[in-house]
């Protein structure tokens, strides 16, 4: 039995002049049914609420202000789920709506609760359909894209694979629409992702660098670090859906780490919202990065923000580059007090234990 998460992008759902959103969803759902009939499990992460809401309200262009985006999402989400429910019900499947914000994954308890609920739903042969709760999410606690959310969902349920359905055939070395020498990238190992992301960021002044590819690379990095294989596939081609369900290597495959960092470290790295920042010295950086040590007070150079025990902080080196995140064992006030009294016996106090410290 396989458990897959499939993310369906807006570019797929909006359809064409010849094909409506409902027809697109019906084609997708019929393909998904063939996968489910083999005894497999499926979770969908779907975009499209804002687009459908705009369509319903006769708004011609995507809104820029948050309140209008939230309003159109509220209207569109009803239509979106109605379409999925109507089509899947006709095919003999039950669905469940799951709306998530960053705040829902911010605590370990809520992350685990979401994980348990999703797992129970698929055990009951229900198809969970996940979307970001755009109606209540503010800018600070907003994913802004379902690529990142789909990776976190895949980690939460220990999925075998994450499928990113989009409107491009592969990841490319350059924007193929502007560069004739662009070549498709068929396979990517986790160790190569950082370089690919950097190259993409260098081209961020063009449409290719600022669009959906950037978030898909982030999604692939999150999932593969946690041990989940990722496949980027052109979902506008009906034949591709058959190919992926037969485990054929189409599109771009992102291979997971051979030794994944695990569910908890993945959550620490990508799901939590940090409330402070700790700068460490070179010795402490070497200790946590190369030796897997805990962060001790003696290695701390500076503290920013106010935090209490078990809150999340960003950990940076002397160049202010993020090197880790973790949950603190000491409040910011007590840590500052220790830093102001370096001669006392508290310099060996653990600030962030290695079990709750995740390298960036």
From Swiss-Prot:
Q: Extract the InterPro entries matched here.
A: AceGlu_kinase-like_sf, Asp/Glu/Uridylate_kinase, G5K_ProB, Glu/AcGlu_kinase, Glu_5kinase, Glu_5kinase/COase_Synthase, Glutamate_5-kinase_CS, PUA
Descriptive protein name: Glutamate 5-kinase
The subcellular location is: Cytoplasm
Print the organism lineage.
Answer: Bacteria, Bacillati, Cyanobacteriota, Cyanophyceae, Synechococcales
This protein's source sits in the domain of life called Bacteria
Which Enzyme Commission numbers does its entry carry? 2.7.2.11
Q: Which reaction does it catalyse?
A: L-glutamate + ATP = L-glutamyl 5-phosphate + ADP
Residues forming the PUA domain are 275-356
What PANTHER family does the record point to?
GLUTAMATE 5-KINASE
One GO cellular component assignment for this chain's record is: cytosol
> What function does this protein fulfil?
Catalyzes the transfer of a phosphate group to glutamate to form L-glutamate 5-phosphate.
Pfam family, any one: PUA
Q: Name one GO molecular function term.
A: RNA binding
One Gene Ontology biological process: L-proline biosynthetic process
Q: Which gene encodes it?
A: proB
């Amino acid at each position: 039995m396989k458990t897959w998460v499939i993310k369906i992008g807006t570019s797929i759902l909006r359809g064409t002049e010849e094909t409506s959103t409902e027809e697109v969803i019906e084609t997708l759902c019929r393909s998904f049914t063939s996968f489910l009939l083999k005894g497999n499990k499926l979770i969908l992460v779907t975009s499209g609420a804002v687009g459908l809401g705009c369509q319903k309200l006769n708004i011609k262009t995507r809104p820029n202000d948050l309140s209008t985006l939230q309003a159109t999402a509220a209207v569109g989400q009803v239509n979106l789920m109605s379409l999925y429910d109507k089509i899947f019900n006709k095919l003999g499947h039950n669905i469940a709506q799951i709306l998530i914000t960053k705040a829902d994954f911010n605590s370990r308890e809520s992350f685990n609760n979401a994980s348990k609920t999703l797992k129970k739903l698929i055990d009951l042969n229900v198809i969970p359909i996940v979307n970001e709760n755009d109606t209540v999410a503010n800018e600070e606690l907003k994913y802004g894209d379902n690529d990142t959310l789909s990776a976190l969902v895949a980690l939460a349920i220990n999925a075998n694979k994450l499928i990113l359905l989009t409107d491009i055939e592969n990841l490319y070395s350059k924007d193929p629409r502007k560069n004739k020498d662009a070549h498709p990238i068929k396979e990517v190992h986790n160790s190569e992702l950082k370089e690919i992301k950097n190259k993409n960021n260098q081209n961020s002044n063009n449409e290719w660098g600022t669009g959906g590819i950037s978030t898909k690379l982030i999604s692939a990095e999150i999932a593969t670090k946690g041990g989940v294989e990722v496949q980027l596939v052109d979902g506008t081609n009906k034949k591709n859906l058959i190919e992926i369900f037969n485990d054929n290597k189409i599109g771009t495959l992102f291979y997971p780490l051979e030794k994944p960092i695990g569910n908890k470290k993945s959550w620490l790295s990508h799901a939590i919202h940090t409330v402070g920042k700790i700068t460490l010295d070179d010795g402490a950086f070497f200790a946590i990065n190369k030796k897997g040590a805990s962060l001790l007070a003696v290695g701390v150079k500076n503290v920013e923000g106010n935090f209490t025990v078990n809150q999340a902080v960003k950990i940076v080196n002397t160049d202010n580059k993020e090197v880790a995140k973790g949950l603190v064992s000491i409040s910011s006030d007590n840590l500052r007090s220790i830093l102001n009294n370096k001669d006392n016996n508290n310099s060996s106090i653990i600030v962030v234990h290695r079990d709750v410290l995740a390298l960036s």
